[in-house]
């Protein structure tokens, strides 16, 4: 028996013209352009070898120092300074190279573990649903998360062309960002778009 009270959900979802809403906290900018707010997600797209990972590395470096790196500016609240980075495509060796690049861009030492960056490689996990559950677990069980990067979001689905799977994945992103008040930065190759 379904016990969901749709009347309560419906009433809670209504927006009134007299309601007051503030712009969600802007946490990532490129120049004057807003590229990230808490409670939302964004997608970097481009062809293979189009420097998507480099740009995301610069964004993460800016978030790591909570300041400017190249053209990116980050301003996360102190309670949202932890960064989770998930790579679904590369080997641990290549993931470590990306992590070192992030640290160099942030002008931080590459021989000392960064306090608020957790970098996870998920390539060896074959089941896309298990990858997704690991990401969900980390988001909900890591203190002070403000930024989550998913490099290779297409690897969280079995079939990129399946609209049901795509809708469920986008629903997860919306739920995670909303419930945890975080920004999720995803990356996908243009061949998958």
Task: Describe these PLM feature segments.
Residues 77-161, 168, 175:
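Conserved inter-motif catalytic segment of the P-loop NTP-binding fold
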Residues 2-102:
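The Walker A/P-loop phosphate-binding site
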Residues 141, 167-190:
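Substrate-engagement module of ASCE P-loop NTPases
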Residues 5, 118, 179-181:
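Short, flexible loop motifs at catalytic/binding sites
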